[in-house]
UniProtKB/Swiss-Prot annotation:
It comes from Francisella philomiragia subsp. philomiragia (strain ATCC 25017 / CCUG 19701 / FSC 153 / O#319-036). This is Dual-specificity RNA methyltransferase RlmN. The keyword 4Fe-4S applies. The gene is rlmN. Binds 1 [4Fe-4S] cluster. The cluster is coordinated with 3 cysteines and an exchangeable S-adenosyl-L-methionine. Disulfide bonds join 106-343.
Length: 370
C-alpha cells in the first residue's frame, strides 16, 4: 500500500531536515529545498536545478508541495488586498495592508472560530477545523508571489505578519508555531520576532507555551476593562479571567521581544466606549503593572449585528483620555472596508465559509435516514 506523500510546504527547517534523513538523504539538501520553496517560490522539484536527478525523482515519489487554490484576489482602492483561499472545501481569508515603509499581512489560523466573541462576524460562522501548518504558511507564500508580480520586483514585501485573521491562533498552537518558525527563518522569509505578532483572545496556558517555544510579539484582544463585561462579549473570559490573563501578559512583556503588550480594544457605542470604561481600563493596567500599548479599533458593522460604531468624537475622546493618562494609544485605520477586509469583517463574500449550514443539514438528513 502506497504511503501518502508528505507536503513539504508546512515543514519548518528542523522538520524538513528530519524528513530528508528519513529517506536517506543529507540535511543540506533539505535546506536547499526549503530555500527553493520559500525564498524562490519554486514548487516543482524538476525546477530545483541544484538537486541531482536521482534526488528529484526520490522527492517526487515521497513528497509534494501543495499550494491551496486562490478563489479570488481583490484589491481595494486604498491598496489593500484580500485573498479567499480554498482549503479543502472550506475557505479562509488573508489580507495585505500596505502602509508607507511597511506591508502587513493578516493571516488566518482556523476555518471559522471556536470562541464566538459577540461582536465578531467571523465567529458567527461557527467552527470547522484548524488549518494545517502548510495552510497557514501558504497564505504568506501566496501573498509574496502575488505582490511581487504586481510590483515587478520579488522583494516588495510583506514586512510584518499579524496572526489576526480568522480563528484563535493559540487554539491551533501545534500548527501555528511551525508556520511562524518558517516566517522567521532566514532561508525563508527572514522576519524577526518583533515583526511577527500573534493576537489572542486569552488562551492563558498557551501564552506561557508561546513564550517558551516561539517568543513572537504578543497582542491581546481585551475589549473590556471588567470581567463582567468581558464575560459577555469575549466568552473565553469565563474560563481565563482578566487577572489570569494579565499575569501571563506581565511575564511575556518581561521575557518577550517587546517590553510591552499591545492590547486591542474594539470600541462599540455605549457598550465599552464611555469615559468610565477608559478610567477602568487605566486602573486595570496600572494596578497589574503590565507595560501596555493600546490599539483602539472602531467597530466595523456587519449585517445583523446589534452593535454600532461610535462617532468620531467619542473615539477621539476615548483616545485622548488614555493618552493624557500616559498610555501610548493608537486608533486603527479602517482599511479595505470596500472589500470586507476590515478588522472583524472576515466573513466576507461567502458568509458560510465553514460550511456550517451544509454540515448541519447533512447531519439532519443522516439522522432522518436512520
Amino acid at each position: 500500500m502506497q504511503q501518502d506523500k508528505i507536503n513539504l510546504l508546512g515543514l519548518n527547517q528542523k522538520a524538513i531536515e528530519d524528513f530528508f534523513i528519513s529517506i536517506g538523504e543529507k540535511k543540506f539538501h533539505a535546506r536547499q529545498v526549503f530555500k527553493w520553496i520559500h525564498k524562490k517560490g519554486v514548487i516543482d522539484f524538476d525546477s530545483m536545478t541544484d538537486l541531482g536527478k536521482n534526488l528529484r525523482n526520490k522527492l517526487k515519489e515521497n513528497a509534494e508541495i501543495v499550494i491551496p487554490k486562490v478563489v479570488f484576489n481583490k484589491a481595494s482602492k486604498d491598496g489593500t488586498h484580500k485573498w479567499l483561499i480554498d482549503v479543502g472545501g472550506s475557505a479562509v481569508e488573508t489580507v495585505f495592508i500596505p502602509e508607507e515603509g511597511r506591508g502587513t499581512l493578516c493571516v488566518s489560523s482556523q476555518v471559522g472560530c471556536t470562541l464566538n466573541c459577540s461582536f465578531c462576524s467571523t465567529g458567527k460562522q461557527g467552527f470547522n477545523r484548524n488549518l494545517s501548518s502548510a495552510e497557514v504558511i501558504s497564505q504568506l507564500w501566496i501573498a509574496a508571489r502575488t505582490l511581487s508580480k504586481n510590483n515587478g520586483e520579488h522583494d516588495f514585501s510583506v514586512t510584518n505578519i499579524v496572526m489576526m485573521g480568522m480563528g484563535e491562533p493559540l487554539m491551533n498552537f501545534e500548527n501555528v508555531v511551525p508556520a511562524m518558525d518558517i516566517m522567521m527563518d532566514d532561508l525563508a522569509y527572514g522576519l524577526s520576532r518583533r515583526k511577527v505578532t500573534l493576537s489572542t483572545s486569552g488562551v492563558v496556558p498557551r501564552i506561557y507555551d508561546l513564550l517558551e517555544q516561539s517568543g513572537v510579539s504578543l497582542a491581546v484582544s481585551l475589549h473590556a476593562p471588567t470581567d463582567s463585561l468581558r464575560n459577555e462579549i469575549v466568552p473565553i473570559n469565563k474560563k481565563y479571567n482578566i487577572d489570569e490573563l494579565l499575569e501571563a501578559c506581565k511575564l511575556y512583556a518581561e521575557k518577550g521581544p517587546h517590553k510591552h503588550i499591545t492590547f486591542e480594544y474594539t470600541l462599540m457605542e455605549e457598550v465599552n466606549d464611555n469615559l468610565s470604561d477608559a478610567e477602568q481600563l487605566i486602573e486595570l493596567l496600572r494596578s497589574r503593572e503590565v507595560p501596555a500599548k493600546i490599539n483602539l479599533i472602531p467597530f466595523n458593522p456587519y449585517p445583523g449585528t446589534p452593535y454600532r460604531k461610535p462617532s468620531n468624537n467619542r473615539i477621539h475622546r476615548f483616545k485622548e483620555f488614555l493618552q493624557h493618562n500616559g498610555f501610548v494609544t493608537t486608533v486603527r485605520k479602517t482599511r479595505g472596508d470596500d472589500i470586507d477586509a476590515a478588522c472583524g469583517q472576515l466573513a466576507g463574500d461567502v458568509m458560510d465559509k465553514t460550511k456550517r449550514k451544509e454540515r448541519y443539514l447533512k447531519k439532519l438528513g443522516d439522522k432522518n435516514a436512520i
